[in-house]
Swiss-Prot record:
The gene is rpsN. This is Small ribosomal subunit protein uS14A. GO terms for molecular function: rRNA binding; structural constituent of ribosome. One of its GO terms (cellular component) is small ribosomal subunit. HAMAP family: Ribosomal_uS14_1. SUPFAM superfamilies: Glucocorticoid receptor-like (DNA-binding domain) (SSF57716).
Amino acid sequence: MAKKSKIAKNEQRKIVVARWAERRTELKETIRRPSSSEDERAEARAALQRLPRDASPVRLRNRDAADGRPRGHLRKFGLSRVRVREMAHRGELPGVHKSSW
C-alpha cells in the first residue's frame, strides 16, 4: 500500500496536467511549426518554461487503482502485477485464467 500523501499528490498532478494541457499543446505546436518565426519560437519556449512544473504529463505516475502501488503497473488492467495475480487466482478478472500446456 502506497502512502496516502503520494496517491493524493499524483491525483493533484492529474488535475494540473488536465488544466494546462491545451495551453501546452498550443505552445508546442508553435515551436514545431515551420512557418513560425524565431521570435515566436523563442517566446513560446519561454512561455512553456513559465508553466507549472507539474503541468507536464511526464510527471504523472501510473499507480495501481486498488492500493496505489507505483511499480509493476499493467496498463491493460490498471493494476499492479501482484494485484492482477491475486485477482486472477480468485477469478475476479473476466477472461483471465491460468495458462496450462
